[in-house]
Amino acid sequence: MSMIPGERRYQDGQRVRHRTFGEGVVVSSKLTRDDEEVTVAFPDRGVRKLMASLAGLEVRDQPGV
């Protein structure tokens, strides 16, 4: 999925899955110059800061759904 410039793809509270770290919850995300920095809390791996373009995160659900 391509990202629209200036728009965050990940929202606080969103459940995601990472191929190495497993399932986690987005704590925060912020746009950088040309990417999105996503902070995710993984139950067994701690809190990780990931660059969206490299992380390969799979969205599991939307917050509030």
List the model feature ranges, each with a label.
Residues 21, 43-45:
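Glycine-centered tight beta-turn/hairpin loop motif at sheet-sheet or coil-to-beta transitions
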Residues 48-65:
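Intrinsically disordered, low-complexity, charged/polar segments
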Residues 22-30:
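Short beta-strand-centered aromatic/proline hotspots
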Residues 1-15, 63-64:
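Mixed-charge, Lys/Arg-rich low-complexity intrinsically disordered regions
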Residues 33-39:
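Short aromatic-glycine-enriched beta-strand elements
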